[in-house]
């Protein structure tokens, strides 16, 4: 039986190993995208000086709208509980576009743009740099990533059976990484012990990641948790359309798929072009006039909030909680007077409204805060190294088994 698992482990690793390395390494690079971006562009994400009180939200939104072309409008604002963080203002287009404004001075600090490096890593992680076919053809990059990830699951499981020690002493020795007995011993220990230490994290990342690759897998995965899904429309859809009886899945703002993304409501266009009041000119009230009223109501009712997002007619509250990092309480309000008319709390949602956020949180390691993110980062790096160390050990073994007479001899001059 061990020989069977050894063959499975070997012959799946040889063709898919390098792809697994690329997927794991690019995934590791995305874990701390937000922190790296904020460190490199602090002036964009943080205010220069915290004042006694921010400017009225209506004034801030009007300032941002004045900088936009006529074809783009303000659709919402995300307010952090951290007074040093600038307000994030979401825009109607392009997709997931946003700008940042200093809430104390009204200065627009800039527009969010994903760094080319992280965009490259994201496309590598999801599609091996392939692009969706406009004619509806096969999305090869997505399929190859999904197939490689599925094979990785079998490689990991078979590796456990190959590794499984026969005695307690062997178990203890097999979980040590020895660095002073030669390179071959070091790479062997890193491959074996590193794989076992990161097994749970790697399996969790692989099993959740497959939900983005295959509809059949996503359907089965969701059914395991008692959730029915509708077939995804088109290629590259990042998540399934869960049939949520208790509101939209996860209760999260829309437009937050993938690694390292920023939140942002995509509410209806509040007014005419550029987010400016249209129709009867000055006689029409600003579409943003009640946003601050809604924000203040929600902030007072939820003192432990992480972020409050407000758009035209809807709002959401996110918290610093263990578990699903996309869990939000969602609200609807009357845009004419700011009265909250409906509340959908995350705790009241059925599984169909929570599973997508849980899948994402487990996949990127954010479910347990900074600790699990660090562990996920380390696990992904080790996962990227496993095929490389495996290739090294396999080649060394092949060379060692080669008959002496067939090995290349140095040519004497």
Question: Which residues does each predicted region cover?
Answer:
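Conserved histidines in hydrophobic membrane contexts and catalytic metal-binding motifs
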Residues: 1-413
């Amino acid at each position: 039986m061990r020989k069977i698992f050894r063959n499975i482990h070997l012959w799946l690793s040889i063709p898919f190993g390098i792809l697994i390395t690329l997927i794991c390494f690019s995934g590791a690079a995305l874990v701390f995208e937000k922190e790296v971006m904020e460190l490199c562009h602090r002036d964009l994400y943080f205010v220069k000086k915290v004042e006694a009180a921010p400017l009225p939200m209506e004034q801030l939104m009007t300032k941002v709208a004045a900088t936009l072309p006529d074809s783009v409008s303000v659709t919402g604002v995300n307010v952090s509980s951290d007074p040093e963080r600038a307000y994030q203002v979401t825009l109607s287009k392009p997709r997931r576009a946003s700008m940042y404004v200093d809430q104390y001075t009204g200065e627009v600090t800039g527009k969010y743009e994903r760094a080319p490096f992280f965009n490259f890593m994201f496309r590598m992680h999801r599609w091996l740099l392939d692009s969706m076919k406009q004619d509806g053809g096969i999305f090869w990059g997505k399929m190859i990533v999904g197939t490689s990830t599925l094979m990785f699951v079998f490689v990991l499981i078979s590796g456990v059976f190959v590794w499984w020690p026969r005695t307690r002493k062997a178990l203890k020795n097999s979980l040590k990484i020895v660095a002073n007995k030669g390179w071959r011993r070091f790479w062997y220990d890193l491959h074996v012990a590193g794989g076992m230490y990161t097994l749970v994290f790697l399996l969790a990342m692989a099993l959740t990641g497959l939900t983005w690759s295959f509809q059949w897998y996503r359907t089965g995965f969701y059914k395991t948790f008692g959730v029915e899904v509708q077939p995804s429309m088109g290629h590259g859809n990042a998540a399934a359309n869960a049939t949520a009886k208790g509101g939209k899945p996860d209760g999260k703002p829309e437009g937050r798929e993938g690694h390292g993304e920023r939140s942002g409501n995509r509410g209806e266009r509040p007014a005419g072009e550029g987010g400016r009041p249209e129709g009867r000119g000055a006689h029409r009230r600003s579409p943003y006039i009640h946003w601050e009223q809604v924000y203040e109501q929600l902030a007072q009712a939820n003192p432990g909030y992480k972020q409050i997002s407000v758009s035209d007619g809807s709002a959401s509250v996110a918290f610093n909680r263990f578990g699903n990092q996309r869990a939000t309480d969602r609200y609807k309000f009357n845009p004419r007077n700011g009265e909250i008319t409906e509340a959908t709390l995350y705790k009241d949602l059925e599984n169909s409204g929570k599973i997508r956020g849980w899948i994402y949180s487990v996949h990127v390691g954010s479910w347990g805060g900074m600790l699990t993110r660090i562990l996920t980062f380390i696990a992904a790096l080790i996962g990227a190294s496993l095929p490389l160390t495996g290739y090294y050990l396999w080649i060394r073994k092949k060379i060692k088994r080669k008959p002496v007479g067939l090995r290349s001899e140095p040519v004497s001059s």
